[in-house]
């Protein structure tokens, strides 16, 4: 059981690695944000759909040339702000639909929603690595565990511009060597924020506590307030929705709907706290992968061996708090097929912080290239 749970969390078995590195790429190829030039899927050369390996190799070759260009330095009038990336385990659009939470108020508070974001994997470790390496194009699963150019690391790019890196988890990070992978493959070297004194109502299947996310976020906000107006970039991984979690005192796996409801409520409450704090914060909510609450023709519900669309089609939202001219109305929807490089591109456009003090913001220009996809070939998707 323990080996299977580790497989589910990390994708550590050879068969799963092959699926990450090959099968899903056939669906995903051609839909990655083009680096350095915007967030839309670029025009792709024709490929023989009867030769999937050739198409796949062609895709990886294109991806090698895609990067986000961060500035070498910030202008003198740059405005400091906090970047908070909330990485949620086990949440896809299909899961929200299954438990009727797609219209939770949390999502209507977003300024930008990626409606067609692809997590590119069905496991936590690879998803976190891909997010931390968001400033370069996609790699095969195997290459995630190989050295990569330093410019690929999103948080390193921010650190070079004066952002202090911070790390939060609502778990220990020990199981499946998750924290170790963040350090070694994601180059996240910031010390883990203390969890001392934080309550927990959930435990993971192996009995480890899963700490209260609202309490952790409130502690984070308190620390930012005490730290003044410096620039920070925080990676926060949360796992209350992971399968096998239990309420304290129970030996039964907790139902998904109440856990999702509580997580969304807590994030919603935290955004209200941020608004009242007066801090300038860019909040990015980006799930690792889905929970597979709904099965498909490829596999039954609860299984994530095949990274099908029900698992990799995840809700990604961005909220800018503390703006002089905040976004009005419904979230700006980005329907273009996109992934992590699109997030890196948007962060690079926000990095000087001037958007917070401008009397008006051209949201269309801010997301230019993320809203109108150029033509790309049809790809093979599981049906």
Residue ranges and their predicted role:
Residues 7-19, 23-29, 36, 46-232, ...:
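Active-site-proximal alpha/beta segments of enzymes that process anionic O-linked groups
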Residues 106, 154-157, 262, 266-274:
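Catalytic-core regions built around general acid/base machinery
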Residues 140-145, 204-206, 253-260, 271-272, ...:
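Active-site rim elements
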Residues 245-267:
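Active-site-proximal segments of metal-dependent phosphoesterases and phosphodiesterases across multiple
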Residues 267, 284-285:
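Pol beta-like nucleotidyltransferase catalytic core
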Residues 280, 286-324:
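Histidine-centered active-site microenvironments of extracellular/periplasmic hydrolases
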Residues 351, 355-383:
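Phosphate/adenylate-binding glycine loop and adjacent helical scaffold
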């Amino acid at each position: 059981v323990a080996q299977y749970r580790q497989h589910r969390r990390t994708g550590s078995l050879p068969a799963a690695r092959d699926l990450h590195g090959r099968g899903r790429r056939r669906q995903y190829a051609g839909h990655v944000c083009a680096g350095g030039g915007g967030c839309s899927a670029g025009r792709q050369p024709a490929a023989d759909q009867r030769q999937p390996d050739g198409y796949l190799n062609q895709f990886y070759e294109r991806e090698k040339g895609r990067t986000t260009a961060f500035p070498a330095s910030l202008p003198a009038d740059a405005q400091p702000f906090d970047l908070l990336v909330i990485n949620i385990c086990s949440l896809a659009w299909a899961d929200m639909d299954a438990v009727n939470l797609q219209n939770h108020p949390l999502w209507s508070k977003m300024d930008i929603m990626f409606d067609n974001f692809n997590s590119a994997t069905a496991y936590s470790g690879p998803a976190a690595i891909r997010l931390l390496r968001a400033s370069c194009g996609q790699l095969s699963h195997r290459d995630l565990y190989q050295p990569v150019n330093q410019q690929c690391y999103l948080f390193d790019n921010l650190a070079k511009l004066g952002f202090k890196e911070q790390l939060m988890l609502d778990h220990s990070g020990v199981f499946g060597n998750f924290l170790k992978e963040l350090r070694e493959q994601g180059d996240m070297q910031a010390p883990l924020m203390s969890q001392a004194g934080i309550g927990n109502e959930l435990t993971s299947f192996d009995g480890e506590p899963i700490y209260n996310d609202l309490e952790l976020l409130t502690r984070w906000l308190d620390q930012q307030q005490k730290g003044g107006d410096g620039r920070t970039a925080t990676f926060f991984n949360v796992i209350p929705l992971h399968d096998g979690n239990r309420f304290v005192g129970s030996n039964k796996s907790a139902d998904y709907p109440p856990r999702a409801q509580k997580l969304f409520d807590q994030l919603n409450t935290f955004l209200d706290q941020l608004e009242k704090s007066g801090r300038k914060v860019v909040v990015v909510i980006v799930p690792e992968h889905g929970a597979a609450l709904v099965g498909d023709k490829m596999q039954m519900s609860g299984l994530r061996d095949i990274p099908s669309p029900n698992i990799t089609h995840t809700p990604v939202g961005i909220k800018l708090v503390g703006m002089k001219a905040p976004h009005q109305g419904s979230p700006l929807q980005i329907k273009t097929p996109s992934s992590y490089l699109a997030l890196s591109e948007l962060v690079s456009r926000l990095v000087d912080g001037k958007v917070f003090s401008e009397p008006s913001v051209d949201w269309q220009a801010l997301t230019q290239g993320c809203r109108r996809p150029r033509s790309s070939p049809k790809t093979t998707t599981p049906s």
